[in-house]
Amino acid sequence: AGPQLDVSCFAHDKNIGSRTEQLSVVHVASAQDCMKECQALPTCSHFTYNKNSKKCHLKAGAPEFYTYTGDMTGPRSCEHNCSDACWMDGNNPLAVWDYSGQPPALCWAACMGTPGCDLYTFQGMTCKLYSQTSSKRA
């Protein structure tokens, strides 16, 4: 077994699921294994893992959160935890999401799962998605 993946950037005990369309469902032993499955699929932006059923739901698209007992929703990777005005605001974002209480890495997952999204900002609780033509790098 290789090094353990970092799964510290999202809540494991808040019962947060994602309604986003799923690519597939697999049975795995842990959130780390679920993240590994997501990373193996090029179009997987995030996943929902249920610690009770051990089901790993692999998702493509921006996370759409809801409450479900035992669920935890995490990004493809915890490496993308940029926050605090990583990108300057453009005039017309592709999408604006209220991600109250969610980690910046799930805003990155929303960008990855949104066609045309190249950049994102995560300020306060707001995740904004941009194409390269709608914003400039800070």
From Swiss-Prot:
This is Microneme antigen L2. Belongs to the microneme antigen family. Contains six disulfide bonds. A carbohydrate binds at S18, K59, Y66, D71. Disulfide bonds join C9-C78, C34-C56, C38-C44, C82-C86, C107-C127, C111-C117. It comes from Sarcocystis muris. GO terms for biological process: cell adhesion; proteolysis. It is found in: Cytoplasmic vesicle, Secretory vesicle, Microneme. InterPro entries: Apple, Pan_app. The keyword Repeat applies. Keywords: Cell adhesion, Cytoplasmic vesicle, Disulfide bond, Lectin, Repeat. Its main location: cytoplasm. Galactose-binding lectin. Plays a role in adhesion to the host cell. Has a potential role in invasion of host cells. One of its GO terms (molecular function) is carbohydrate binding. The keyword Disulfide bond applies. Residues 9-78, 82-138 form the PAN domain. Homodimer or heterodimer. GO terms for cellular component: cytoplasmic vesicle; extracellular region; microneme.
